[in-house]
Each structure stands twice: as C-alpha cells, then as structure tokens.
C-alpha cells in the first residue's frame, strides 16, 4: 500500500483515499468515522508500536496499528 495511516507523522494531516479491510473491519472503521475523503490528523503514537490517537473532525479515536495499515491516505 502506498501511504497508510500507520506511516503518518504525529501532528500531520492527511485525507483518507481508501479503506482496504475485510468486511467486518471495514464496517467498524466506517462507524468510527474513517470514510473516504475525510481529513484526519495523527495526534500521537503509543509506545512500542502501540495504538494511534487520531482526530477525525472534532472526534478523537484510538486505533490499533494493524487497523491503521488498512487505511490508505494522501497528504
């Protein structure tokens, strides 16, 4: 995958281009606000490849690294 949410640097923003996940995970990510075209900002990373703190609009979400790798972004 070209650029995933997992590769974003804290403090930077990006747009969601696609969500490459199996159906159940895709539905869960969509329900949390990860939709194509949305602007997101990575707030911080957990230690030792821990979860990511992401801001989508005015909503803060914590997401696992492996799930973040399913979200393709464009800077």
Predicted feature residues:
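Short alpha-helix capping/helix-loop boundary micro-motifs
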Residues: 1, 24-28
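A structural micro-motif recognizing beta-strand termini
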Residues: 18-22
